Amino acid sequence: LAATPSKTVADEVKASGSATVTGVLGIVSDVKVTAKEDTAQVEEVLQDITSDADLQKAAGASKEKKTTIDVTVTQAFEMQTSNLLDAANVKLTIESKVIEAAYEDNEQVTVLVAVPKTKADGTVTYTYYTVTGKVVDGEIVVNLKGRQVKLYGSNFVLVAVKTIEG
């Protein structure tokens, strides 16, 4: 995985996110999901991914197939909900110039969901879940169910990865 990009590159790879929630019969529970810029949190997640072989394997890296993974885009999200239904549909979207360069339209994308947990001593650890997104019109779209989002909690980071052969 590449080292921390320069400021110019960081501006190029800057992502923006959005979220849409729909429920049964169009009923939307009281949910507010916002994309946020959290550089420190994203840095911690990237450190985890670069140093954890099991996590890389879960994301698609394989010694046998000689494949590695490359992080293409990250986006932190914050969710406030009082009544998210388990069956509700939550669509998270990540937009970045990198996506158009890295993926074909309609390509399936492995997305790691990094969920922070603060221990009693103040240290933060992350639990990772793997979901699949899809590239639609140059954006990565991840469709989740309400029960998944509730599991992730109020604060999480989506990390899109690309498997690279060779």
Located regions from the model:
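Short, surface-exposed loop motifs enriched in S/T, G, D/E and P with embedded aromatic residues
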Residues: 129-137
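Feature for mature exported/ectodomain regions
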Residues: 1-75, 80-123, 161-166
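Polyanion-binding catalytic cores of nucleic-acid enzymes and NTP/SAM-utilizing transferases
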Residues: 126
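Hydrophobic residues in beta-strands and at strand termini
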Residues: 94-96, 135, 144
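C-terminal beta-strand-rich structural cap/linker in extracellular carbohydrate-active enzymes
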Residues: 139-166
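Extracellular adhesion/glycan-binding regions together with long Ser/Thr-
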Residues: 71-78, 137, 142-146
